[in-house]
Structures are given as C-alpha cells and as structure tokens.
UniProtKB/Swiss-Prot annotation:
This is DNA-directed RNA polymerase subunit beta'. The lineage of its organism: Eukaryota, Viridiplantae, Streptophyta, Embryophyta, Tracheophyta. Belongs to the RNA polymerase beta' chain family. RpoC1 subfamily. It catalyses: RNA(n) + a ribonucleoside 5'-triphosphate = RNA(n+1) + diphosphate. It is an enzyme of class 2 (transferase). Its cofactor is Mg(2+); Zn(2+). In plastids the minimal PEP RNA polymerase catalytic core is composed of four subunits: alpha, beta, beta', and beta''. When a (nuclear-encoded) sigma factor is associated with the core the holoenzyme is formed, which can initiate transcription. The gene is rpoC1.
Length: 680
C-alpha cells in the first residue's frame, strides 16, 4: 500500500518480473510460497468460499473478514501475543480484510507475451527501439513467421547460419510436421525463434547507449545531405529524421528511469487485488462479476492448456503448440486492451467486455473519476457564468457555497468575538442566517484565496487562485478573460472550488497561482488572457453602429428603422435629430436614463485635432445660424466655425458603445503607464 506521508509522487511504468513476484509472493510458516494464481475459479458453488489458488484465494489475497481465516478461526489483529499469524490448516494470514484492496497475485505465463500497449499503441515503443516495421513485428508476435537463430560451428536442421536478418516467411512448409511436442520444442529452442520470445531476445540484446550514438550519427548524416530535389525522397528523409529523434528520446527515457527494454515482454502477469474486481450478490441470489474476472479466467484457461501440451502430452504437433501460444497472446491482449486488434470480445448478451484499459482511461476511469476527481472536504462545484464587473483576480462565490466552505472559520470567528458560547450555538446562528454571520464571512473571505479548477486539468493553468466575493444566486461568477486558460466557456461548464488550508498552500496560491499573474501561456509564451467568443461578439455589437457613416444612416431609406409588418413611405419618414453632448459623462448618463440607445448616433464634443483642421475633405452639409456661425458636417465629424472661419469646436459622430469602449481602453493605458512609472 502507498503511504501518502512517505511517497510524494506516483509513477507508472514497466517493472521487472522480479518486482512483480516480490509484490505478490509471501511465505507461510510451513515454508510454502504463495502468490501464483493457477486455477481459473472464483467461489465454490456450494460453500460460497473462495477456491484455493483461484482468483479470490484467501491465502494469496488475504481474508474476506478481518482476522478470520478460511477455516473460521479468529485471531485479534495486531496482538503480538496471539501466535501464529497464519492459520496452520489453511495458510490464511490473520490480518484485516482491507489487505484485499492492495495485495496482488500473479500468473506465471508458460510462454512470453508481448505487452500490447508497447506494441500496438502509437507510437510503438518496441518498433521504435528495434527499428523494424510494426507489421513485421506483429507477424512475428502472432507466430506468422519466424527468425533463424544464430548458431555457429554446429550442424543445423535448416542449414542456416548467421543473424536474425534471415527470415523464413513460411515456416510451416519449411519445417517437416513429423516432430513430436518435445522434439519440436527442442528444435525450436535450438534453431528458430518466433512469438513474443523472439521479441524478448532482440530487446535483451539491445545496448541503449549504442542506439543513441548510432541514431545521432545517422541524423547528422541525413542533415548534411540537404534536399535531393525529389519531393518524395525529401519527405522520406524528414520522416526518418523525426523517427531517429523519437528513438533517441525513448532510449534516453529508458536509461533515465532504469527500465530494461525486455520488460515490455511479460513473463509474469500481475493479478489485480480482488476488491478492485469484485463479485457482488444481487437480489435473487444472482452474482454480478467484474468483466476483468472473466478475462483473467480466459488467460488462465489458455495458459494451463499450453502447459498441458508442453508437459503431459508427447504426441501433440508443434503447429498446435504455436496456435496455443497465439491464443495466450490474444487472451492477454484482450485483458489489457479489448478491441485494440480489431473486433472486441463480447459476452453472451453481445456486450463488450471492459478491459483493464477501459477501467483506467477516460472520464469514468479509475484516475479521473476516483483519484483525480474524487470528492474532498472544503470543496464545492457549480456552473460558471460571466462576471463582467469583476476584476481579473476575483471570482464570485454564491452565498450557499461560501458559507459551507468557510463554515469552520465563521464558527471560530463567532466564538472568538463571544457571539456564540459553543459550536452548537454558532451552527444555529448560521442556519438562521443572522446578519453577523455574513459580516464575519466577509472578513474571513478577504484573507482567504480559493482555487478554481476545471476538469480535465491538462496544464497548470487548469487550476488558478482567485479572491472570492459574495454574489447572489447559485452560480460561480468568473471574469471572461481567464476562460482561455481553463478552456472554459459559459454554455453550462462546471468548475470546482477548493479552499487551501495550510500556510504553504495559501502562500503558493497568493504568490504563484493568482490569475492576474498567469497572463502568458507556459507552453509558448503567448498572451493567454485575450478576448474570445462572447467578448468578441460583444465588442462587435458595441462598436458596429457608426461604421456606415452619416450618408448611409441618414439618407438611405433601407437603413432606417423598420418594424415588423410596417412599410416605409418616403413622405412619412421623419428624421430623428441626433443629440449633442459636451462630454462622455453626459452621453452615458443619457443612456442610463434611457433617452438614447446603445447604438444611437450622437455628436460628442472633442478636442481640436490638427488632422481635422488640415483636412481637405469637402463637407456633406453646411448649417448656418442666425448669429453668423455655421456647422460644417462631414461623414464622421462636425466643425463649428465663426463668421471669420475660425474653428470654435469639433464634434465627432459616435455612439455610447464607442464611448464606453474608448474609456475602458484609456483607463487601461493610463493604469499601465502609472505602473511603469512606479517601477522606474
């Protein structure tokens, strides 16, 4: 079992047969070594007790009931005075039943079996290390052809000498079928190699450091050649160079992690603890079993059959032995990854068996559902909605979630301020929603950041810290600019909220994980807090009204307001006078008073611009007043001049949307300039 206080991380990789054996085997007082599962049985149909040396054997995996052996004897767990620790009759250890959650067993395979993840998954690690085509290796693994063994200075049946480069495509026609089982086994071990055993031999002969050196030399030679002028040849060279890079990286990984390449071929097959593949009794006395149990039974059946062919029977043809080895390989493939080689295995009800890969991968797999996504204390979950008024480093927490997350802190605050005499009184005040509770909650939240996480957490920006504030409703409010880091949008996505408790976690949340400190992508360094989706649509709607200019909006009947089922008559059309405003505050105030719309054209007084006064543009209209002043109206601005043609002021034609957008940009630039001046 993994001790969370001793082990800070978990790594998944290949292990040696010796390590698998060490995990599973144990020695009972009579000197017998147990751990190997040899029988494909589960429970006896009469006694409902686990079969000895079966998939649920109590000697191998521990007792079903704590301190009770298979005979029914009881011993106190942890009492050193109670001897012995094993039952002398059945050999079951007197320990807690929880051991069945982590105690493993193993199946000793009669023939080596290639791990299908390393063979069939792309990229194929075995094909990369051996530098051979995947189809050729598959044919070798599934006994479609064989290699000649290197035998020197000895007479051979096939008269073959040399290395593995000589391949016999049709071994069944090259080898006479008059060999007996023992004779064929001796002949094969001496002169030919096929199946996963051939792969294991080649992997064992590899020198990873030589692979790195040779691959690097070949990569440099290909780089020095340059383009050939033939597009097809150039593509082959590029693909070869990419392959060599992957091969070197793979070899370095094996060296760095102390993994031997031949461990990708299994000699011992681990058996999962029984509690991870249970058999449950339902109504009516029927049993429901995990699919993995059936797949394990299939492996054991075929492995035992192969053992019988090689040990007991002497007249079995060698071809039958080959076929049985292939069946063992296919059974292990189905156990590890059902359907990876084509048609998946199904039960009697035409339902696909769930293999080991199906159990651990995906959203409902062991890692994402049970380990990474399990429920923990001081956490909550809700739908996210946009909070446009929030700062980048703030998030809005619903009152219902906030009072649950910070309940212990609020109780401590009530007791410290002598507002509650004990925990029970404090909880009753929280249930009654007294005003003092929300005041203390506000104080607590000011000093406590929270972590927001959206699954799947594929990179470090998938979980960030925020300063929480209380909001109404039952949804979490989030600034739209932080959505890209979470890969979230506001179409029903949910996010989890966690409270960091320790001082170390709070310091990490404040110094490293705040959203306004993670503005760049950790992968490529590009800005990640950029407007997307809803924000772009909002900016378009906010600023799209005046693009057509005064001519299109004022003189084109098609652009006038047209209500449903209402015809436009030129004679009845009445032009709505566009209002004038001295500053942006008056314009925005008129919008909030609903005197104008967000996209209503208006004239806003603006500072004099040298480009306007020097422009040679011809005005569209000129309005003269009784005092002698006149207005020159252009497409997007208006100039008020005196009789002497002096410029009094300039008005620009805009909308409230444009004004709001301009003010936000102006405030952001001013804030950035002030920050830069403080730094200098």
């Amino acid at each position: 079992m993994i001790d969370r206080y001793k082990h800070q991380q978990l790594r998944i990789g290949s292990v040696s047969p010796q390590q698998i054996s060490a995990w599973a085997t144990k020695i009972i007082p009579n000197g017998e070594i147990v751990g190997e599962v040899t029988k494909p049985y589960t429970f006896h149909y009469k006694t409902n007790k686990p079969e000895k040396d079966g998939l649920f054997c109590e000697r191998i995996f521990g007792p079903i009931k704590s301190g009770i052996c298979a005979c029914g004897n009881y011993r106190v767990i942890g009492d050193e005075k109670e001897d012995p620790k094993f039952c002398e009759q059945c050999g079951v250890e007197f320990v807690g039943s929880r051991i069945r959650r982590y105690q493993m067993g193993y199946i000793k395979l009669t023939c080596p079996v290639t791990h299908v993840w390393y063979l069939k998954r792309l990229p194929s690690y075995i094909a990369n290390l051996l530098d051979k085509p995947l189809k050729e290796l598959e044919s070798l693994v599934y006994c479609d052809f064989s290699f000649a063994r290197p035998i020197t200075k000895k007479p051979t049946f096939l008269r073959l000498r040399g290395s593995f480069e000589y391949e016999i495509q049709s071994w069944k026609y090259s080898i006479p079928l008059f060999f007996t089982t023992q004779g064929f086994d001796i002949f094969r071990n001496r002169e030919i190699s096929t199946g996963a055993g051939a792969i294991r031999e080649q992997l064992a002969d590899l020198d990873l450091r030589i692979i790195i050196e040779n691959s690097l030399v070949e990569w440099k030679l290909l780089g020095e050649e340059g383009p050939t002028g033939n597009e097809w040849e150039d593509r082959k060279i590029v693909r070869r160079k990419d392959f060599l890079v992957r091969r070197m990286e793979l070899a370095k990984h094996f060296i760095r992690t102390n993994i031997e390449p031949e461990w990708m071929v299994l000699c011992l097959l681990p058996v999962l603890p029984p509690e991870l593949r249970p058999i449950i009794q339902i109504e009516g006395g029927k049993l429901m079993s995990s699919d993995i149990n059936e797949l394990y039974r299939r492996v054991i059946y075929r492995n035992n059959t192969l053992t019988d062919l090689l040990t007991t029977s002497r007249s079995t043809p060698g071809e039958l032995v080959m076929c049985q080895e292939k069946l063992v390989q296919e059974a292990v493939d189905t156990l590890l990854d059902n359907g990876i080689r084509g048609q998946p295995m199904k039960d009697g009800h035409n339902k696909v068996y769930k293999s080991f890969s199906d159990v651990i991968e995906g959203k409902e797999g062991r890692f994402r559902e049970t380990l990474l996504g399990k429920r923990v204390d001081y956490s909550g979950r809700s739908v996210i909605v946009v909070g446009p008024s929030l700062s980048l480093h703030r998030c809005g927490l619903p009152r219902e979630i906030a009072i649950e997350l910070f309940q212990t802190f609020v109780i401590r605050g009530l007791i410290r301020q002598h507002l509650a005499s004990n925990i029970g009184v404090a909880k009753s005040q929280i249930r009654e929603n007294k005003p003092i509770v929300w005041e203390i909650l506000q104080e607590v939240m000011q000093g406590h950041p929270v972590l927001l996480n959206r699954a799947p957490t594929l990179h470090r920006l998938g979980i960030q810290s925020f300063q929480p504030i209380l909001v109404e409703g039952r949804t979490i409010c989030l600034h739209p600019l932080v959505c890209k880091g979470f890969n979230a949008d506001f179409d029903g996505d949910q996010m989890a909220v966690h409270v960091p408790l320790s001082l170390e976690a709070q310091a990490e949340a404040r110094l490293l994980m705040f959203s306004h400190m993670n503005l760049l992508s950790p992968a490529i360094g590009d800005p990640i807090s950029v407007p997307t989706q809803d924000m772009l649509i909002g900016l378009y709607v906010l600023t799209s009204a005046t693009r057509r200019g005064i001519c299109a909006n004022r003189y084109n009947p098609c652009n006038r307001k047209n209500y449903q089922n209402e015809r436009i008559y030129e004679t009845n059309y009445k032009y709505m006078k566009e209002p004038f405003f001295c500053n942006s505050y008056d314009a925005i105030g008129a919008y909030w008073q609903k005197r104008i719309n967000l996209d209503s054209p208006l004239w806003l007084r603006w500072q004099l611009d040298q480009r306007v006064s020097a422009s040679r543009e011809v005005p569209i209209e000129v309005h003269y007043e009784s005092f002698g002043t006149y207005h020159e109206i252009y497409a997007h601005y208006l100039i008020v001049r005196s009789v002497k043609k002096e410029t009094f002021c300039v008005y620009i034609r805009t909308t409230v949307g444009h004004i709001s957008f301009y003010r936000e940009i102006e405030e952001a630039i001013q804030g950035f300039s002030q920050a830069c001046s403080y730094d200098t």
